Amino acid sequence: MEKHTLEALVRSVVGKKRAVRRLRRQGFVPGVVYGPDVEPLSISIKRSNLIKLFHEVTEASIISLTVKDENGKEVFSHDVFIKNVQYDKLTDEVKHVDFYAPEKGHKMKINLPLEFVGKAKGEEKGGVLEIHHHELPVETLPNAVVEKLEIDVSNLDLGQALYVKDLKLPEGMEAELDEEEIIAIVSTPSGLEVEEETGEEESAEPEVIEKGKKEEE
């Protein structure tokens, strides 16, 4: 699994709106990193680096975070995950980021991205592949995390569904959804059903006529 890197600075002034606004004007985004064995640490990240990172990662991506003080000395280094991102309602700019530093052997909850590959059998017959979940909430050990879960749908026929219980999750990872929850299904368009029914009726009609002829004879 690819590991991404990010550098941050210790944020000494915390909770003061004026200081936070000044920080943002300077091109930085305030954030915090915390975990089971990590005391909350206030940090600031260069906005351009953060935006670049967001284009490369998901909630399930491991990020190697290094935090330095104002003198450039490293004060913290840990593998982290993005836990929460706050956006400005008007400008949609990133306002704050929470990073979670997991403890080895300690389970955590994330949303695992699902990637569907292949073309379902049912699609070739006119069906439509409906995706009910693009992410799967899971509880997992840090070493079991994958950036995404690939799901092959090529064997799904008309009317067939893929359930949570059908997914092959890494050892140490458990789905938070009911095992009977539908992940994806190949639905049959109503027009296709009508055509099939009409075809059955047409094939049955000659038999009736044939019987009528025999009775007349």
Curated annotation (Swiss-Prot):
InterPro entries: Rbsml_bL25/Gln-tRNA_synth_N, Ribosomal_bL25/Gln-tRNA_synth, Ribosomal_bL25_b-dom, Ribosomal_bL25_C, Ribosomal_bL25_long, Ribosomal_L25_dom, Ribosomal_uL5_bac-type. Keywords: Ribonucleoprotein, Ribosomal protein, RNA-binding, rRNA-binding. Pfam families: Ribosomal_L25p, Ribosomal_TL5_C. One of its GO terms (biological process) is translation. Residues 187-217 are annotated as: Disordered. GO terms for cellular component: cytosolic large ribosomal subunit. This is one of the proteins that binds to the 5S RNA in the ribosome where it forms part of the central protuberance. This is Large ribosomal subunit protein bL25. It comes from Thermosipho africanus (strain TCF52B).
